[in-house]
Amino acid sequence: MMGDGEAIRVYVGADRSQLLAVSVLEHSIKRHTNAKLQVIPMVDLPVPKPLDPRNGQRTGFSFSRFCIPRLAGYKGKAIYMDADMLVFRDIRELWQIPFDGAKVVIQREVKHQETTTRKEGAPSKRIKQCAVMLLDCERLNWTIESLVSGMDDGKYDYEQLMYQLCVLDEADVNYGIPFEWNSLEHADADTRLLHYTDVYTQPWTYAGNPFGDRWFAEVRLMLQDGSLRGSDLRREIELGYFRPSLVRDIRFGHLVPGFLRRGFDLYNRGADKAAGFIAHKAVYEAKKERGRAIQEYLERTGGTSAGGV
């Protein structure tokens, strides 16, 4: 394990479209701690494709968390986070959660199902996930090649790997991260980390996320302290990664009274549509391509599976 004087290492799973979101996350982490910190984006890592496309990554970084021990030199411990997050408390609180003999620490429970699943773009049920993890890199001998080979050999499938961590014994998994450190589409006075997990309504691509004001406020602080320039924001918009109306939200959103907010959001959504903006276009194109690859695979194999599904 790392000593007290060593940096807290936070590895962030992302693709190119989320790099600015990583910067916003990093800013929020640093703003709430004076600990030594390293935030390492994981973008376009060399990850082999499983033979069965049904076992392929759902995003460009789904398997990135399993690359962390090797990236860390199999030394010390590390935190994994997704890019679509914002932190409101000292990261040391998460860092100091004990492993209690386990190799990883993941989320304990999923709260507020009854309200967050009613939100536009939300799933019907939220599952326990590993979007925030503590990893003891010294005790995890993972290589992404061997993990993908396990799927190719039919030992497990994507869901078993990602959601059940089937490559670990149950004793190696500590369910010690409270919901407040992976608060799915929910924020209150106890929230430590807000996770904008619903792709359809992330505040940089959708006008109307009920907790988008937190993200906009962080961006305003970055513009004020010089860690972000207006030209950086405009570049992401020009590339199609962020919605055109985001600039209006950043500039004026905090000045809009509550009773006018819905109209403001509807206006922004209309403006984005008129501008031809398609949220997460590359993600949805990749999803379609994955569907085609699965169909071709099933036709070629007669419906048999090389990945245990």
Regions found by a protein language model. Give the residues of each.
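Hydrophobic targeting segments
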Residues: 7-12, 29
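Short, acidic, metal-binding catalytic loop of nucleotide-sugar glycosyltransferases
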Residues: 28-36
